[in-house]
Amino acid sequence: NIPSETIFGEASETFNGRLAEPIEKNLAPFSDFLKAHSEFAFGVATDGDADRCGVLLDGGTWLSAQDTIVLLTDHVINNKKTGGDIVKTSSVTGKLNLFKKKNRKIRDVQVGFKYITDEMVKGGVACGFEESGGFGFSFHIPERDGIASALLLCEMLAYSNCKTLSEYYAEKKKKFGEIYYDRIDYHFEHPNRLEILPHFAASIPQSIAEFKVLDTLSYNSSRGVVNGLKFILEGEARWLLLRSSETEPMFRVYAEGSSDAEVKSLLEQGMALIQSYNNE
């Protein structure tokens, strides 16, 4: 019997005056609650339909979705001994390559959980993750489920000798290392902006921010046009992802590297690459 408490559990058309997305800036009241109640091991918040979740450590500190993904992957693969590949959207941390083995691949798909579901339905998948807090597991249903994810976090902690999630996270961080990741929304007006990523998919730069480009992954829209381009760079968990919006003059730029400064540099290089497009 594990004591628990629910806050903001009542139905609210306005989600108590906040956006329903379970990200750090929307969970300030939850963080304040945990700061005032040290008896809780951690906290989990879901969005309105409970298919995504966000995690707070005891004490109210935000645990990023990327860190949550690594912890859940470790639990599913190493504690629960679940067989199969790991599916991740292109914006999820490259740290998941640490779980790659001869009989376990990492399947990289474009952003959107429906692409993870497609892989889960094909079979041979242990779990699937998207950067926005949607997690799915082969022993459940081929869909993201925030409540199932919360229960797995409880189970994960029960497998350990740790009393709190912050203690558990500190131990695992020694094993897996720090994750340095960020994303920005880049407003860019260009009459032929939807041609930018197809251009660079056909003319790949040899290096970005002085790192050699080892591989590229391209993702197509429903119309068959490249709307996502990921550059895999030399080093561990180092990459740059560019995604274009078809409905607004916007590019989403994502990066992971070995330090905050490096990630900032990669994001700047991503914006510079977009700016460099010249359709003469």
Which residue ranges define each predicted feature?
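Phosphate-binding and adjacent anionic-ligand microenvironments
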Residues: 42, 81-254, 260-280
